Amino acid sequence: PDDKLNFGKEVSLKIYDRLEIAAGLSRYQIAEQPKFPTKSKILNDRRGDFMLLINGMPVIHMELKKSGVSIKQACNQIEKYAAEGIFMGLFSLVQIFVAMNPEETVYFANPGPEGQFNPSYYFHWADFYNEPMNDWKDVTTALLSIPMAHMLVGFYTVADGSDGILKVMRSYQYYAASKISDAVSKAKWENDQQRGGYIWHTTGSGKTMTSFKSAQLIASSKDADKVIFLMDRIELGTQSLKEY
């Protein structure tokens, strides 16, 4: 009522922009020991370890364990909180979960209230040469710092249309898609000696997702007038259309 200019009117608010990484209106905060109210009167309120917030929105939630305690306990804690309905309302904005002790870290996407946690999609971060990073300081610097944490949430997650569950890319998929997009941005199209490239890996490694994300990054960057996503099998095309 005090805002007579806008009271009763529709107001547009810009609360998140994946392109404004460490710049523009993006503001980053860390919330230590966030308190989660439970839906049950029997259960006590829960308290997490910490969250990364972008413009006040919780996007990455972390559970920590001391040295010698398996990160499986941190994963189980996250799964338990989700089963208790903790990540609802404002906390449903959490995109990525991280379970960490000083010697090991895994990260995974929030499957949402209707999804199921699948340990097969709990990933360890690795460097460009696919050497696993285990020390918490290395993981924090490479994955959880800005700009990488913002980029992971904004560019390297995929909403799977086939099951409605969010997917997050493995580290080698991130490096591949990023390098392909960078190569296109630096290409000199007037040069007649342009060469193509290919993504090679084993079955089940996520080549289709890497290809799709590469095409999406190139298209959104406006570095190419048109991007064609071509598949060599009808069933692969049908699957990709459903998923992406």
Predicted feature descriptions by range:
Residues 1-226, 231, 235-244:
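ATP-dependent helicase/translocase motor core
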